[in-house]
Amino acid sequence: MSCNFTVNKYNDIHEIRIKGKARKDWEQWVLLTSDRHWDNPKSDRLLQTEHLKLAKERNAIIIDNGDLLCVMQGKYDPRGSKSGIRPEHNVDHYLDKVIDDAANYFAPYGENFAFLVVGNHEASVSKRCETNISQRFADQLKLKCPASQIHVGGITGYIRLRFDIDTTHCSYLID
């Protein structure tokens, strides 16, 4: 089942336009997450997988509000600690490995991803390593799941959910 939404950007507002039918049983699920820190050894991947599978089953739109990745163990991060690295990520090209593994992990749910906010962890890496971790992840996810419409936003901004139900339109702003 494909997701029935599109994502567009207007200045600092990302709009998720959802199409539906005026039926008594119509509903749209949204999985709203933040601070997954997916690559951290303490991250609860079993719970994340459970939520992602449920989102796919419900045809939910996935919005991640930042810190999808921890990525604090890089060379230039003063908060880093080698004990905070999963064994499979303890390699020379640490950031590349985390991005590739994350894209593989989230690819089965890529079609449901609408929006990814840059969290303070990703922003710190961008500042110190001169690379946009969030955009690199989104690009890799799109390569693995071409149907993904994932958009990357900044640390601040707005998300508007616009519902197009037959000829009726209504919207809700998330700020």
Predicted regions and their residues:
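Short glycine- and acidic-rich boundary segments immediately preceding or forming the N-terminal edge
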Residues: M1-A22
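Residue-identity detector for threonine
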Residues: T6, T33, T49, T131, ...
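Short, solvent-exposed coil/turn segments
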Residues: K9, D25-E27, H169
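Core catalytic region of metal-dependent phosphoesterases/phosphodiesterases
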Residues: R17-W29, T33, W38-H151
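His/acidic metal-ligating clusters that form di-metal
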Residues: F115, D139-D175
